[in-house]
């Protein structure tokens, strides 16, 4: 790991030591982790994510992982799965649909992990590898490990949260729609009761408020 600066990692390799190293870096995070996983979360990463931490870890998936219960098992793991909005009364004006240009990856094909991006020692791991066994052992891939560059970390974090919030909202809409039309109604309240969950210590919304306000 470079003290400050950029290092490179290349594949294919004869073993999974590189993935194990990424997993150790994730496990040593101090304030937050942000991960994109186009083809599911590797078992080595799942071993880290299944153990609770006192900070938030965000995972953005192309499709539902085979171990969704494990990923959601830790209360401070925030997981979003890519999707489009279901049909609704507004579809004549704002119906979402896929382009159909790619049959293997519909939504998310970026590969990066961000560790402690808003701290003094941010780490961005990004490149062409899928954080998978195949991409490590068989594919011709390259990754950059960028340490201590706050500007790069800010850019990657902004793009991650743009995508995460976009798809997390669509996941909530699908979940509401599955429970029936009455449960799907959610009107704005005419008081400040909505903010209570952002001030309940230890909850995801509480920690998210503090983290993005600079209290980390």
Segments predicted by a language model, with ranges:
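PLD/PLD-like phosphodiesterase catalytic module centered on the HKD motif
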Residues: 43-216
């Amino acid at each position: 790991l470079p003290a400050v600066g950029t290092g490179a990692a290349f594949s294919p390799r004869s073993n999974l030591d590189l993935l194990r190293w990424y997993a150790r870096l994730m496990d040593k995070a101090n304030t937050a982790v942000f991960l994109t996983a186009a083809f599911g979360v590797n078992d080595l990463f799942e071993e880290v994510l299944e153990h609770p931490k006192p900070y938030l870890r965000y995972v953005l998936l192309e499709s539902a992982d085979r171990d969704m219960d494990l990923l959601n098992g830790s209360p401070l793991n925030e997981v979003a799965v890519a999707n489009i909005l279901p049909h609704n009364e507004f579809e004549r004006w704002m119906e979402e649909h896929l382009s159909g240009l790619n049959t293997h990856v519909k939504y998310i094909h970026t590969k990066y992990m961000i560790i402690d991006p808003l701290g003094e020692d941010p780490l961005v791991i990004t490149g062409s590898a899928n954080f998978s066994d195949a991409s490590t052992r068989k594919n011709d891939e390259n990754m950059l490990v960028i340490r201590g560059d706050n500007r790069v970390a800010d850019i990657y974090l902004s793009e991650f949260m743009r995508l995460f919030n976009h798809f997390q909202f669509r996941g909530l809409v699908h979940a509401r729609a599955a429970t029936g039309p009455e449960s799907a109604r959610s009107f704005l309240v005419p008081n400040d009761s909505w903010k209570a969950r952002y001030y309940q210590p230890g909850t995801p919304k509480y920690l998210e408020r503090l983290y993005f306000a600079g209290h980390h």
